[in-house]
């Protein structure tokens, strides 16, 4: 680490502590050349994978697009913003946990459906009807019957 005072390359870590709920490391450093002390903060760069669309095109992950789609499904439903944000964090965590640089958009769609099913079954059906392109009432009935049979996976 370069010293911000004299530009020397040799610094020594005097103290390290976790801060920001363990998301950051605070380090107290001392320059071996000039003796000045300074603080650095380190955070991991967590990059979300790019999405591979069904047509084969690739695009960066867009959190706002994800949020808007979920909000549309949850419109006029009794789900708090906090619960929605928690679901978004959960989806992003699962995407990062894949360790992949690219994931199929279908993976994101399935993660959204799983989260919406936990949040609100009506919102889940709304999203599923568009996502899975329901063509008639029978497809709605089949999905509702499946929901009634299968417990929600936490």
From Swiss-Prot:
- Note on how the cofactor is bound: Binds 1 zinc ion.
Ranges for domain ATP-cone come to: 49-139
- The name this protein carries in UniProt is Transcriptional repressor NrdR
Lineage: superkingdom? Bacteria
Keywords, comma-separated and alphabetical = ATP-binding, DNA-binding, Metal-binding, Nucleotide-binding, Repressor, Transcription, Transcription regulation, Zinc, Zinc-finger
Alphabetized GO MF terms = ATP binding; DNA binding; zinc ion binding
Listed under GO biological process in this entry are: negative regulation of DNA-templated transcription
Its required cofactor(s), as named, are: Zn(2+)
Describe the function of this protein: Negatively regulates transcription of bacterial ribonucleotide reductase nrd genes and operons by binding to NrdR-boxes.
Tell me its family. Belongs to the NrdR family.
- The record lists its disulfide bonds as none
Q: Where are the zinc fingers (unnamed)?
A: 3-34
Which InterPro entries has this protein been placed in? ATP-cone_dom, NrdR-like_N, RNR_NrdR-like
What Pfam family is a match for this entry?
ATP-cone
